[in-house]
Amino acid sequence: MSLPKDLLYTEEHEWVKADEGSYVIGITDFAQDQLGDIVFVELPEVGDTVAKGDSIGSIESVKTVSDFYAPVTGKVVAVNETLEDEPELINSNPYDTGWILKLEEVEEADVKALLSSDDYEKVLD
């Protein structure tokens, strides 16, 4: 299982990456593996303000439908529209081409509460 050291994580298996004033968000390799083959992704709208812990979309696999939660509070400035036609990118490359959304105006306290890769690894054990 892949677990990049430069990302931050949540106990709900989302990852967060700082990217020049914004934060890119997706689900972890562990999460996509548990879901199985992903067939559909419901994305939030650009311009939406989301609060930490809110359900902001869903991920449908051949096994189940799972809500996707905001790991931090912020404003949606981009969504990965490629996932509308190729949701399986989350399975094949969850940390790169399988990213889900990008937030700005993020609350720093939320970022500080995220887990390091080492701490997230302990959650998985």
From Swiss-Prot:
Residues modified as N6-lipoyllysine: 63
Domain Lipoyl-binding: 22-104
Family label: Belongs to the GcvH family.
Coiled coil spans: none
Keywords: Lipoyl
InterPro entries on file: 2-oxoA_DH_lipoyl-BS, Biotin_lipoyl, GCV_H, GCV_H/Fam206, GCV_H_sub, Single_hybrid_motif
Source superkingdom: Bacteria
Protein name (record): Glycine cleavage system H protein
Cited SUPFAM superfamilies: Single hybrid motif
Subunit structure, interactors included: The glycine cleavage system is composed of four proteins: P, T, L and H.
PROSITE patterns given in the database record: BIOTINYL_LIPOYL, LIPOYL
GO cellular component: cytosol; glycine cleavage complex
NCBIfam families per record: gcvH, PRK01202.1
Cofactor(s), names only, from the UniProt record: (R)-lipoate
Role summary: The glycine cleavage system catalyzes the degradation of glycine. The H protein shuttles the methylamine group of glycine from the P protein to the T protein.
Name of the gene this protein is made from: gcvH
Pfam families named in the record: GCV_H
Cofactor: how bound: Binds 1 lipoyl cofactor covalently.
Disulphide linkage map: none
